[in-house]
Curated annotation (Swiss-Prot):
DNA-binding region extent: 2-78
Protein encoded by which gene: eg
Tissue: During embryonic stages 10 and 11, expression was observed in four neuroblasts, NB2-4, NB3-3, NB6-4 and NB7-3. Except for NB6-4, expression reaches a maximum at the very beginning of expression or in the period of neuroblast delamination. Weak expression is also observed in a few putative progeny of NB7-3 during late embryonic stage 11 and 12. All eagle expression in abdominal segments disappears by stage 13.
Region annotation (Disordered) ranges: 126-149, 179-251, 323-343
GO BP terms in the entry: cell differentiation; central nervous system development; regulation of DNA-templated transcription; regulation of transcription by RNA polymerase II
Official protein name in the record: Protein embryonic gonad
Family of this protein: Belongs to the nuclear hormone receptor family. NR0 subfamily.
Keywords: Developmental protein, Differentiation, DNA-binding, Metal-binding, Neurogenesis, Nucleus, Receptor, Transcription, Transcription regulation, Zinc, Zinc-finger
Pfam family name, one: zf-C4
Main location: nucleus
UniProt cross-references to SUPFAM superfamilies, sorted A to Z: Glucocorticoid receptor-like (DNA-binding domain)
InterPro entries linked: Nuclear_hormone_rcpt_NR3 (IPR050200), Znf_hrmn_rcpt (IPR001628), Znf_NHR/GATA (IPR013088)
Upper taxonomic lineage: Eukaryota, Metazoa, Ecdysozoa, Arthropoda, Hexapoda
Coiled-coil residue spans: none
Amino acid sequence: MNQLCKVCGEPAAGFHFGAFTCEGCKSFFGRTYNNIAAIAGCKHNGDCVINKKNRTACKACRLRKCLLVGMSKSGSRYGRRSNWFKIHCLLQEQQTTSGLGGGSSVGSGSGGGVSSASLEQLARLQQASNQARQTYQDKTNPCIKSATATTSPRIEGAAVGTGIGGGASPSFLQAAKLHHQRQLKLDSRLSNTPSDSGASSAGDPNEDGVTSVLGGQIATPSSTNATSLPKLDLRHPNFPATSEPDADMQRQRHQELLEIFRSHSEPLYSSFAPFSHLPPVLLAAGVPQLPIFKDQFKAELLFPTTSSPELEEPIDLSFRSRADPASPMAHNSNSPSLSEPAAASHCLGESTNFVRKSTPLDLTLVRSQTLTG
């Protein structure tokens, strides 16, 4: 193929997006066609030269040249279609554009192949370039400045259109600009600060002056709808301050709201504080603290206590005679044991009652006499 790329001058690889381009320009246009807003504006006012060496230096100028040579989305292939079909679609689009123009000559040079879609893309690219340049130049608040720069021409056109006899005074245009700037500041302040009572009521003194200047010139939607009474400026120095009864009512209302909030915020009952309802005098008198109460409660759950004396008595494993069915633990705690024979004889001499000694259980291995037949 003897064709050259219409964008950078490199040997063309084929007919892509409605023009003979190389592979690099084809892929660049396919990536950036639907993402124009992400491209930064040209820092040299759109005077960059696009050729084979420096075609990657400025994306904005490269995309602008792609649109100028006739590249568009309608020229892209849907599936695997032949170059003949794409050239046929491009010719039909050019004929439709020339027919809508009423036979008028479309520009000279390469401008004859530019479609309406390309012109629309050029307009979008120019707008994005202006926004990016304004954002690049401004370092303090780029969002508000760029929005002001893009929307101020619309306000000027609207102001000129609403003027009497097609002519608008400079004071009216200046007032419209000031009003728009004030609205932008208010919107940014409301979006950046939380919605609190009285947070958005405070303003700058220059905004008060703008309000007084615009009072008789610009009719806001709220003023057009409400026709009963004029809107009073409460921040004016001649306006009387808030009266004392109103301040007392506001303070009382504030206290009531605080009490309601506290009553709803406190828990009704807490399982971790069983003695919270007791007065501090009883707590200081010896009521167990929370950790002690928890340990005691766990011990009672694991080892329940009963008042039955039969369960409190330990199990006796010793041998006892049939004549003494009582347990040795039922006697006095000072009863003699087998390990102290002297004390046992002394106790038997003093007492008139005979105490039978219990024989302990013998667990030794002793051969007993077995009855053999």
